Amino acid sequence: MSLFIQGVGAVSPLGPNAATTWAQVVAGNEAPRKLLPNRLADREYYYVPVPEKFVADAARQSRLRRSGTLSLMGAAAAYDALADAGFLPGYDLGANCAVIYAICSGGVNYTRRFYHELLTQGPGAASPMLFPETVHNAAASHLAALLKLDGQSYTLVGDSSVGLSAIHFAAQLLTTQPELELCLVVGTEEADWVLSDAFDTWRMAARKTAFEVFGKSAGTIFGEGAAAVVLGRTSGVPLLRTGPGLTFFSRLDALAVARQVVEQMVLDEYPGCVVSSANGTFADRIEAQVFQELLPETPVYAYKPALGEALGASSVFQTVLASLSLRHQTIPGTLNAGNRLPALCRESRPMKIERALVTAIGFNQQVNSLLLGNS
């Protein structure tokens, strides 16, 4: 069965929609950094926030007025993807559309905030509006209600590769359930000080305002945002191949596992470009070795120096950018590019792209990828 990405959407630190975000990354712009607020110790970390004005329209929806930023960003990206797929606001999707959310730590952040208020300010000060957001599937529930969907709704929790797992799951649903017309896959993530501090204990969080990819591994900077894709059976960007991914049990195993995942995804359909998950951590070294072994001449783009590491949303962001690369026949340039990967694209340029490979290596020892074609 042929499946297609019929529409893409996003809200990012650089734009309120996918089109603006794409224009900004192609222009070589970097989103502004700010210090993370509400720190619990004297350690400081930067993050890449989404401006409040970018989710203002979503916040005006009556069903989302008490929702957190996590849910607002997811709804904004979903509406953008549906509009890109040709579905006007108010279109009744009913039970013909399934919603699948990919998330990493967003709900944990709200749990931390709720109990922090409870313990530091007393029971009367803790906001009850935070409590519903502590549940991982809160964002998916809000969106399903907003779109008046009475069908299937799922939330997948994982690391920065979870978005590709969500897309693979959506492809399985469409393949096995002929009555289902569409799957809306949304990845969303909100930053928090405790998240950066946890990653710092693993030496994976940067203390500066920028980080290098495919160079010196000095840690990453977390970014906020949401990305979405609409999967269906009609025209769009062909979804050539997806997979469940594989797990590695130590960093010594990671290279062999990543090589196997990419080999199985590519087969004989070599991509014209790769959209990488490089983020200034151990993942860069593994991807660099795999790309040099299997795809030594293929241009590689890494978006995270521009927008930050968005964890649960990141591989959906990668898929959106890969789809737009195919649509516009252009590969963006990578900011803060190191010297460990000769094929790393450092400046945006037009080029003929027939297939685009998306790869993701997550901190929770997951590796996944997908392959897109040119419509």
Please annotate each region the language model reported.
Residues 4-5, 29-142, 146-154, 188, ...:
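Conserved beta-ketoacyl condensing-enzyme motif
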Residues 110-113, 167-168, 193-200, 251, ...:
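Short acidic, glycine/serine/threonine-rich loops at helix termini
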Residues 84-100, 114-128, 149-152, 175-184, ...:
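Structural signature of cysteine-dependent C-C bond-forming condensing enzymes
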Residues 13, 59-79, 127-135, 153-168, ...:
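Active-site pocket-shaping loop/turn-to-helix segments
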Residues 2-11, 19, 23-37, 43, ...:
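Condensing-enzyme catalytic core mediating Claisen C-C bond formation in acyl metabolism
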Residues 74-82, 140-143, 166-174, 230-231, ...:
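Buried hydrophobic packing segments
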Residues 11, 103-106, 159-162, 187-192, ...:
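Acidic, glycine-rich active-site loops and adjacent beta-strand->loop/helix elements
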Residues 7, 25, 78, 99, ...:
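Conserved small-residue
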